[in-house]
Amino acid sequence: MARAMAAAWPLLLVALLVLSWPPPGTGDVVVQAPTQVPGFLGDSVTLPCYLQVPNMEVTHVSQLTWARHGESGSMAVFHQTQGPSYSESKRLEFVAARLGAELRNASLRMFGLRVEDEGNYTCLFVTFPQGSRSVDIWLRVLAKPQNTAEVQKVQLTGEPVPMARCVSTGGRPPAQITWHSDLGGMPNTSQVPGFLSGTVTVTSLWILVPSSQVDGKNVTCKVEHESFEKPQLLTVNLTVYYPPEVSISGYDNNWYLGQNEATLTCDARSNPEPTGYNWSTTMGPLPPFAVAQGAQLLIRPVDKPINTTLICNVTNALGARQAELTVQVKEGPPSEHSGISRNAIIFLVLGILVFLILLGIGIYFYWSKCSREVLWHCHLCPSSTEHASASANGHVSYSAVSRENSSSQDPQTEGTR
């Protein structure tokens, strides 16, 4: 009998292969599933898998099977009469397959996703009369990283040092970190294994030469990862500790004796903030009429002893710095003319020019009129000259003498008394 069974096995295998071949004229029966499914480490994930059967097509599904590439045996099977069976019953579950129902949905849920679960899986439908249909799905296991950024507080060193730190912890795959800044600088990025197996922690340092100019400025850490819908931006406010930088303001180079008051301000920029201001002169203490009020020096009134070099010394936790200002007091207040504004001077000059132009026009018309009157009188004068003669009765009589004749004859004058 055993020999009979052994002889029957080849015939049985041929029969099974024949049953698995689709008969001629049957429509396309296909399995639908995404090529890749992402899942997060420690969470559950569903591998979708559906059988699409054309209308009016008679298809009988006898079994659903899931297998992983590179491993022998099946990880999950659902038989039409025997129900489900799993290689890990606590981690695997068919989502929709039920006894007594049509087996069209082979979707499989996996719980407690592990790094080693990443790989290629095959979903297979055993159908009749079409035969077996399958599709491959790649399961991508991700770990969403936690991101932080913090400032590295530094002092003036004159050398490049880390001034900001950005960390992306426990990512799978490793996160990508970049920096954005207008201050220059360069990144230094490193990776170490994360707390969970298969994860990576990425640390990036922003390196720059510290100075007072970058204190309080911002740099941005940009973190990109497959699990993010958009990059995460983390802003870091830089901190540089430095001693005071001091200057004195308020002197306009126009102080004079007897001026009611004047004020100077000691401008200091430092980190940490200044803790003290001290005013003095190069000759020693301040004169009595100069009163220090913190960052300000009130001078009331302005007198000759203030005609010196003033010193403001500022202190903070890192040291002390000072600034000097030389004051020269004038004998008297500015003249009134010095107070005339530029606009007033411009209007005054324009007024004088207009007056001179009008005066010139008036003189021109006056002389023009006089010249015309002189010419008119000359036109009325006769061409002959009159000569006076005395009459017999003692009266003087005049006779006209031609100018032409007067040139050849001497004038004759008669007179009787």
Curated annotation (Swiss-Prot):
Residues 21-343 are extracellular. Glycans are attached at residues 105, 120, 188, 218, 237, 278, 307, 313. One of its GO terms (biological process) is homophilic cell adhesion via plasma membrane adhesion molecules. Residues 145-237, 244-328 form the Ig-like C2-type domain. The chain crosses the membrane at residues 344-367. Residues 1-20 form the signal peptide. Disulfide bonds join 49-123, 166-221, 266-312. Residues 368-417 are cytoplasmic. Residues 368-372 are annotated as: DYNLT1 binding. One of its GO terms (cellular component) is extracellular space. A motif (ITIM motif) lies at residues 396-401. Induction: Transcriptionally regulated by SHH. Keywords: Cell adhesion, Cell membrane, Disulfide bond, Glycoprotein, Host cell receptor for virus entry, Host-virus interaction, Immunoglobulin domain, Membrane, Phosphoprotein, Receptor, Repeat, Secreted, Signal, Transmembrane, Transmembrane helix. N-glycosylated. N-glycan at Asn-120: Hex5HexNAc4. One of its GO terms (molecular function) is virus receptor activity. Residues 24-139 form the Ig-like V-type domain. The modification Phosphotyrosine is found at residue 398. Can form trans-heterodimers with NECTIN3. The extracellular domain interacts with VTN, CD226 and CD96. The cytoplasmic domain interacts with DYNLT1. Binds with high affinity to TIGIT. (Microbial infection) Interacts with poliovirus capsid proteins. Contains 1 copy of a cytoplasmic motif that is referred to as the immunoreceptor tyrosine-based inhibitor motif (ITIM). The phosphorylated ITIM motif can bind the SH2 domain of several SH2-containing phosphatases. The V-type domain is necessary and sufficient for virus binding and uptake. Mediates NK cell adhesion and triggers NK cell effector functions. Binds two different NK cell receptors: CD96 and CD226. These interactions accumulates at the cell-cell contact site, leading to the formation of a mature immunological synapse between NK cell and target cell. This may trigger adhesion and secretion of lytic granules and IFN-gamma and activate cytotoxicity of activated NK cells. May also promote NK cell-target cell modular exchange, and PVR transfer to the NK cell. (Microbial infection) Acts as a receptor for poliovirus. May play a role in axonal transport of poliovirus, by targeting virion-PVR-containing endocytic vesicles to the microtubular network through interaction with DYNLT1. This interaction would drive the virus-containing vesicle to the axonal retrograde transport. Belongs to the nectin family. This is Poliovirus receptor. It comes from Homo sapiens.
